A protein has these predicted regions:
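Acidic, low-complexity mobile loops and tails
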Residues: 13-20
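Residue-level recognition of beta-strand microenvironments
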Residues: 17, 33, 44-46
Length: 81
């Protein structure tokens, strides 16, 4: 499942960040920000138009991600982790 598929209020554990290509700067930056395997993540809010952007939280830090960026983050829903 992808982070972009989670409903508002849902919690999951990050499985991996998908690279679109070799040396993908967006995926690299997501990992630098803490989107790494085993880290819990929660969808706090979704934008009004098409759900873009997503407001997600890792630890005490919140990030606004475009759906395309969130789709690179593969997660395991909390109830399955």
């Amino acid at each position: 499942m992808r982070l972009s598929d989670l409903a508002k209020g849902a919690t999951a554990v990050i499985h991996e960040v998908e690279d679109a290509n070799l040396n993908d700067p967006i995926s690299r930056r997501l990992r630098e920000l803490g989107f790494v395997r085993g880290e819990p993540v929660r969808v706090v809010a979704q934008g009004p138009i098409g759900g873009d952007p997503l407001l997600v939280q890792i630890g005490f830090t919140r990030f606004a991600l475009r759906r395309a960026e969130a789709a690179r983050v593969h997660v395991i829903p909390e109830e399955l982790a």
